[in-house]
Amino acid sequence: KVHVAVGEYLIVKLPDGQLVPRKSDDVNATERPFVGMPMDDLARELRVGPLAEFKVKKSKHYIYIYNTSEAFNRAAVVILESMFNGVNTYVRNMGAKTTAPDVPLVVIMFKSRSEYQEYFRIDPSIIAYYHILNNRVVMCEETPLARVDQALADQQLISTIAHEGVHQILHNIGAQSRMSAWPMWITEGFAEYLAPTTVGNNRRWKGAGQVNDMRMMELEVQIKARDNANWTGDMISESVTARQLTSVGYATSWGLTHY
């Protein structure tokens, strides 16, 4: 399926959801409709190499490939499954048209940092991400912050899972087009707006538009720590023009989107 044409190249969507480049001359057009890979086939294709011994769970829209604890897997599944319908409904109520995903949504969960980094080298501070090209959310149960503050680490992890899950949902229901260029503060601020979570024994998604406790706390700390009355304006200016956001930038982007 052609995602976009770029000069003499096409960006093609494969049945497993990945986007890959192809020369226009190497592609033959067909009238057959695009059909995503069946879940069983995709799960089998994913469970090779470092993922060969991982467990598999499937739902209507998701395939979970994991070797984490069952408790962590359950918490992530509850959040992602509840968000899928909730975010979809919220976006439709805003007046946007949505469509059902045409490929299974893949979520890969690693127990250890070493396995996570071996699968894909990434900044050690990143504990979960949505990969725009392969369409997968990848996360790790073990976080560096846990050695310092387990409660805060849990809150950060659950919040990040929801955030990356929102990115995956929006890019698969037609609300955002993969590889499209949006201002960073809008893309990340809207994801934070849709992804607030609770922590403790009842880890769950709070609902789109509810106060994002993690980001509210960060804004409060930052504002109280500053004496300069102009600093808030500077913080906003820096965030809306940034190509890459700091943690404070994420909090500011959420605040701008929420209020």
Model-assigned labels for residue ranges:
Residues 1-94, 120, 214, 220:
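Compositionally biased alpha-helical segments
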Residues 7, 104-105, 254:
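Short, surface-exposed beta-edge/turn micro-motifs
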Residues 9, 106, 190:
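Conserved beta-strand and immediately adjacent loop positions that scaffold enzyme active sites
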Residues 16, 96-99, 207:
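Sparse recognition of residues in long alpha-helices and their boundaries
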Residues 19, 116, 200:
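Flexible, glycine-rich phosphate/dinucleotide-binding loops
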Residues 49-50, 122, 128-143, 153-156, ...:
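Acidic/His/Gly-enriched intrinsically disordered linker/tail segments
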Residues 51-183:
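Juxtacatalytic substrate-recognition/specificity segment
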